[in-house]
């Protein structure tokens, strides 16, 4: 270990990645824990980590052509009686999408999805139930995807409500905005689903690239806040955000970078 700074690079597909620069305690090495936090602080940290992982998972799997952003709601008379019924409606919808793809011998769909209600633990959690999905179902048209939001069979089949479907258009190589939209209202009751086989973000750790002295100098002279400065450190990447935080207890700086490929292979349909 050289100087006690870890570069933690999270590679999410070919066009998006995040980089954390973390001060290491003297006894830490790659793969070792860095100590324990209080239960409440750890709970908040776990929540932030889960949200970051979701953003990374979305960008690792859905920055590609043909991805659809699907929002499902209910019309009067079709509102589910409770959260569980609403969630089953969405699961059944995703099963119909997968069944139609399999019937046509198309690639297996990939998705992340959430059922959302009102504030959890209150009488409001069954109000305004709705669903958000990021869907990759190559070979299916938008009309077909929308028509599957229904119930019943044959002449009894009818729509459950409104479907808002649009093509994903990543901003600067990522779908952060959509992911954060799905994470909104953290106090609301939510249930998450994802298809099997999604690619995991790739974690790369380097404890020898930077030193504490370097990081301290960059944070105090302002370089650490400059996106152009970091773009020189990571050629072919454009830095979208450089976030610097000072931990008063540890007396050390933490740096978090978000970046995307300057020559993104993405093109809008």
Predicted feature locations:
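Right-hand nucleic-acid polymerase module
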Residues: 1-127, 137-269
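Conserved, short, structured surface segments that act as functional micro-motifs
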Residues: 130
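Long, low-complexity, serine/threonine/proline-rich intrinsically disordered regulatory regions
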Residues: 133-134
């Amino acid at each position: 270990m050289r100087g006690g700074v870890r570069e933690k690079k999270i590679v999410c597909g070919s066009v998006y990645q995040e980089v954390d620069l973390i001060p290491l305690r003297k006894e830490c090495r790659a793969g070792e824990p860095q100590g324990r936090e209080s239960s409440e602080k750890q709970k908040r940290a776990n929540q932030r980590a889960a949200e970051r992982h979701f953003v990374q998972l979305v960008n690792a799997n859905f920055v590609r052509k043909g991805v659809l952003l699907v929002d499902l709601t209910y019309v009067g008379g079709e509102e589910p009686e409770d959260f569980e019924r609403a969630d089953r409606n969405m699961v059944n919808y995703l099963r119909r999408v997968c069944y139609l793809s399999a019937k046509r011998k198309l690639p297996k769909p990939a998705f992340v999805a959430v059922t959302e209600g009102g504030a959890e633990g209150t009488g409001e959690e069954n109000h305004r139930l709705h669903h958000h999905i990021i869907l990759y179902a190559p070979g299916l048209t938008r009309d077909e995807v929308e028509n599957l939001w229904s119930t019943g069979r044959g002449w009894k089949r009818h729509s459950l409500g409104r479907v808002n479907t649009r093509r994903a258009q990543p901003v600067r190589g990522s779908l952060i905005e959509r992911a954060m939209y799905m994470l909104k209202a953290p106090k609301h009751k939510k249930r998450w689903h994802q298809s099997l086989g999604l690619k995991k973000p790739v974690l790369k750790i380097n404890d020898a690239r930077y030193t504490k002295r370097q990081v301290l100098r960059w944070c105090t002279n302002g370089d650490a806040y400059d996106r152009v400065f970091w773009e020189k450190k990571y050629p072919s990447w454009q830095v979208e955000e450089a976030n610097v935080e000072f931990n008063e207890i540890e007396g050390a700086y933490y740096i978090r970078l978000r970046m995307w490929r300057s020559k993104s292979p993405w093109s809008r349909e």
